[in-house]
Amino acid sequence: MKDLDWNNLGFSYIKTDYRFIAHWKDGKWDEGKLTTDSTLHIHEGSTALHYGQQCFEGLKAYRCKDGSINLFRPQANAERMQRTADRLLMPRVPTELFVRACKEVVKANQDWLGPYGSGATLYLRPFLIGVGENIGVKTAPEFIFSVFCCPVGAYFKGGLAPSNFITTDYDRAAPMGTGGVKVGGNYAASLLPHELAAEQGTPERKFADAIYLDPKTHTKIEEVGAANFFGITKDNKFITPKSESILPSITKYSLLHIAKERLGMEAIEGDVYIDQLDQFVEAGACGTAAVITPVGGIQHNGKFHVFDSETEVGPVTRRLYDELTGIQFGDIEAPEGWIVKVE
């Protein structure tokens, strides 16, 4: 195991020893291989550079108490990348190739995965890009699929803590656009709203990110920064927005299952109106990086709405977080198919 300060890692790039790379050419993928080269050499006309023909995923590997290593739902990431590839006229990365690449990268870099109990994980970044000679707006002649990894720490230093958010007039995605798939352009478009949200904070009340409303009516919550939103009602309902322009979060669907099957809640996907926040006693944003970010409050049109607390984590949010992370680290039995062991 590498000599790192495992208890104090942030969420930033740290170069590890190996990454996986595969090439698509003449209608088929090669076998792919591990490499120590962290630099890609691609043609200047590559569609990934000019026309945004690229997509990516994010998932984690976890060290369990017995020393074994878990991957959390990599098949779901593979399927989501396939849906994105279809939308951008890119070749699908077969699930077998995707999962094998992730397992090989984790196994080759297992010294970069921190000890059980440190909160550290190995973050994997699979990506697919269009490359090769090109100048016009059309699909690329060749493609690269690659997976690299970085050790990352617990997202919240000192424990789970709420963050505040503010709505933005900017749209994250358009109806029938690319909001429901994981393309880089969605994230580039979010950089300015994120910056503006942070600038509107004060020393007393900071805003972690922007909340995006539906692009058609600007009345319904869609995403919270780069994460999915959920709310907990007084009558034990777990409610999360449903829209074709929301990225289907694997973490969110895992929480929907846990809320219903493990916590006995009514789990609902539906409209969440920004002017009906009073129905929620707790709220959160969920995604791979933080798992759950408790939402302390939301500012909209100059009014600030507080949920359970600006400083304390709500009891249901805490139970959801503990259940999901317990599954990921192997302390709690997982639903069938959720865990893939790295042998």
From Swiss-Prot:
Catalytic activity from the UniProt record: L-leucine + 2-oxoglutarate = 4-methyl-2-oxopentanoate + L-glutamate; L-isoleucine + 2-oxoglutarate = (S)-3-methyl-2-oxopentanoate + L-glutamate; L-valine + 2-oxoglutarate = 3-methyl-2-oxobutanoate + L-glutamate
Pathway it works in: Amino-acid biosynthesis; L-isoleucine biosynthesis; L-isoleucine from 2-oxobutanoate: step 4/4; Amino-acid biosynthesis; L-leucine biosynthesis; L-leucine from 3-methyl-2-oxobutanoate: step 4/4; Amino-acid biosynthesis; L-valine biosynthesis; L-valine from pyruvate: step 4/4
Cofactor(s) named in the record: pyridoxal 5'-phosphate
KW Transferase (keyword) present: yes
GO molecular function term, any single one: branched-chain-amino-acid transaminase activity
Record key words, sorted: Amino-acid biosynthesis, Aminotransferase, Branched-chain amino acid biosynthesis, Pyridoxal phosphate, Transferase
Gene Ontology biological process terms, A to Z: isoleucine biosynthetic process; L-leucine biosynthetic process; L-valine biosynthetic process
Top-level taxonomic group: Bacteria
Catalytic activity, EC: 2.6.1.42
One Pfam family here: Aminotran_4
EC primary class: transferase
Residue list for modification N6-(pyridoxal phosphate)lysine: K182
Gene3D superfamilies cross-referenced by the UniProt entry: 3.30.470.10, D-amino Acid Aminotransferase, subunit A, domain 2
Reported function: Acts on leucine, isoleucine and valine.
Family to which this protein belongs: Belongs to the class-IV pyridoxal-phosphate-dependent aminotransferase family.
The name this protein goes by in its record: Branched-chain-amino-acid aminotransferase
Native species: Haemophilus influenzae (strain ATCC 51907 / DSM 11121 / KW20 / Rd)
Biological classification of the source: Bacteria, Pseudomonadati, Pseudomonadota, Gammaproteobacteria, Pasteurellales
